[in-house]
Amino acid sequence: MKEYRVYLERARSRQQDFLYPLIFREYIYGLAYSHNFNRSIFVENGGYDNKYSLLNVKRLITRMYQQNHLIISANDSNKNPFLGYNKNFYSQIISEGFAIVVEIPFFLQLSSSLEEAEIIKSYKNLRSIHSVFPFLEDKFTYLNYVSDIRIPYPIHLEILVQILRYWVKDVPFFHLLRLFLYHFCNWNCFIPTKKSISTFSKSNPRLFLFLYNFYVCEYESIFLFLRNKSYHLRLKSFSVFFERIFFYAKREHLVEVFSKDFSYTLPFFKDPNIHYVRYQGKCILASKNVPFLMNKWKYYFIHLWQCFFDVWSQPRTININQLSEHSFQLLGYFSNVRLNRSVVRSQMLQNTFLIEIVSKKLDIIVPIIPLIRSLAKAKFCNVLGHPISKPVWADSSDFDIIERFLRICRNLSHYYNGSSKKKSLYRIKYILRLSCIKTLACKHKSTVRAFLKRSGSEELLEEFFTEEEEILSLIFPRDSFTLHRFHRNRIWYLDILFNNDLVNDE
């Protein structure tokens, strides 16, 4: 965030509504060039090998304006109007430039609001993905019903652009944005296919996430407004965007400006114990009361998406279940409320009573099947979880191969240390350990047993299981009982700011 300060101060002197001139500033594409597009834990971080040119960027923008949009033939899609340039490379550069420019006014607004609220010091911890789990542990054990909701995608990207126009009044900027989407993102059909939108989101992640976050922000602002008006106790917590990789937004009282127009309480939504959590395109709605009120909110969401955002959604896609009988998936974990029953013997004078006490506990466990599926997709094991070698890494040195596998294990241990049961995590580590051994044996053209016997690498590979204990020993006292207790308990880290392939809720 510090790298934006210099450029944001330059934009502060200008009117925030006029973003079009910033598209032609060279420092914008300097940031776009250095931005890292790949955040997967399975590959190395890397930048572009090509050289970019601001002059080429300006030429491409000029050619977009010179195209004749009144004549559209069937062969237009096969023609490349940018001959001599790497179209895919420059589309990502321009897309990144659009995202950086449009983030500027909102980032300035966020910075000023954080300074006024005096929460700058705690802002980093609030941005952590793991910050949601203490909230779940504190609140969800007292709730009875949960609704697992998938936020539908807009049928056309034009809907996302129109939502952004309510906030930024710059006609030339949006005209250029539409031209870019038309040329680079196959926007020449009335209803884009789901595959084309998925391709655009993967090739232009920053711009797509910004537009999508704005769509979710609009829907959540209306939801929080009705929630605040539905009960006399106002919400004091934040409405949060947990995927703050590219778009930073954490606002308090999003709909405070509408309070003057609606001075009465909506009685049909009255529910003081309703809780809402969202990550990416998935949200969890939980309540303590009967499912009748949950059904009210369910149909409210459906009508809101269909009537206000022109997004089709069906009631059968939103299920309402009991927390004690249903597990929900969020942030790469499976969570459910477990009932612990205990019997207490009580004696009063000559009478003895047996009292059964039922307590609730939120179980957060590692989803072993999705993790194995992710490892199989990355070619570390097969679909059954049997480890296989990684031949594409065989050209590296032994140290680099081991370091790559250890880096993946560190990321997994760091993220999944909040699990109630560590057995599944140890199984994933075991798969990676054997995959590392098989990769080294494949490189040296030997069997696994012969390689271990010859090189004595078994002690080195024990780091897969001992490294996390060494990290904990630096934080907590070196007492065996204390370390054993922390291995059994959950540990949430407040420095996890980025998501990866393993925690995407597909």
From Swiss-Prot:
Keywords: Chloroplast, mRNA processing, Plastid, RNA-binding, tRNA processing. GO terms for cellular component: chloroplast. It is found in: Plastid, Chloroplast. The keyword Cell cycle does not apply. It comes from the Eukaryota. GO terms for biological process: mRNA processing; RNA splicing; tRNA processing. GO terms for molecular function: RNA binding. Pfam families: Intron_maturas2, MatK_N. InterPro entries: Domain_X, Maturase_MatK, Maturase_MatK_N. Belongs to the intron maturase 2 family. MatK subfamily. Usually encoded in the trnK tRNA gene intron. Probably assists in splicing its own and other chloroplast group II introns. PANTHER family: MATURASE K. This is Maturase K. It comes from Trifolium gracilentum.
